[in-house]
């Protein structure tokens, strides 16, 4: 159970949400110029609190205090997207500050909904993401990993809270995947961990992340506003890890995780009003997922003397899915550099097909794509130049 914070002044009147958000934004920039971090008393025991307490309370109503908290956090993400990192950091600390205030002014903290814990956890995780800049405002005892641990702990405290679980599950999964990223880095750079298999260190966190991602991936047509390309960036960690250590997992497990990752990316842009830029990010992630799996089967094909036809069919299927997704991407962005990706896929198809006619057709399509890119001003690497010269000879 979370320890109670000192009771501050009670909220009284009601202001419009936007007025409150603007006031919070200004206060975040003003109050957080010094140290700021979550408190042990709030269940974030791995992080010291360097914030000066201020008993001047903002105005809250029962129905909108949590939405205001999310508003602050979302404003921080918008600032980050616009490369205003300092403002993003201020708003992240502002979110943590306001979460603390809500705790201080809640008589029964068990009534706080899951969305509160999700917002608090997401803000803590954002500190770890922006740690290089944020650490200027933190105590020396704080570390990037301590904020990830605090984010996990805060989200876990919300599992028994009332309310919808979607945002909380997303916050938990993201925090577990960031933990994977840090542990892989530590394994590569710290002698004390060098003798421990990296899978032993991180697989428990992978399993926990998947546990919370799976229900979010169900019903890919259902709109979920917190599921955005920005919130799904930790999925790159999962994809990269599984690709790097794919031989440690069963084919069934990899396929299962691939389907979850793909479903989440597609679900993030299911809203017809989704900006084209977000659609592009999501489709590129799906394409990366497909080509990664194609390479997985091609590697198996290179090292197997049995089930050759089955592996060829599986690799071809993933490569054809890749072509379909590339076509979707090219309708969104016709940058000539993208033609080189199409050429790569076609060359992979040529590598695995068994009849010469199909092979020659794929090589021709690859060559044409490279020439089109070159004709549009793309500077080719020596490998592409060599391929075009060899095929055209």
UniProtKB/Swiss-Prot annotation:
Looking at the keywords, is Transcription present?
yes
Q: Which residues cross the membrane?
A: none
Mark out the compositionally biased spans (Basic and acidic residues): 19-28
Q: Which GO terms describe its molecular function?
A: cation binding; enzyme inhibitor activity
Ranges of Polar residues composition bias in the record: 32-47
- Is the keyword Hydrolase in the record? no
Keyword vocabulary terms for this entry: Cytoplasm, Nucleus, Transcription, Transcription regulation, Translation regulation
Task: Name the Pfam families for this protein.
Answer: Nro1 (PF12753), Nro1_C (PF22329)
Region annotated Disordered, chain positions: 1-51
Q: Can you list the GO cellular component terms from the UniProt entry? A: cytosol; nucleus
Query: How does this polypeptide assemble, per the annotation?
Result: Interacts with ofd1.
* Family label: Belongs to the ETT1 family.
Q: What is this protein called?
A: Negative regulator of ofd1
State the organism named in the record.
Schizosaccharomyces pombe (strain 972 / ATCC 24843)
Which gene is this protein's source? nro1
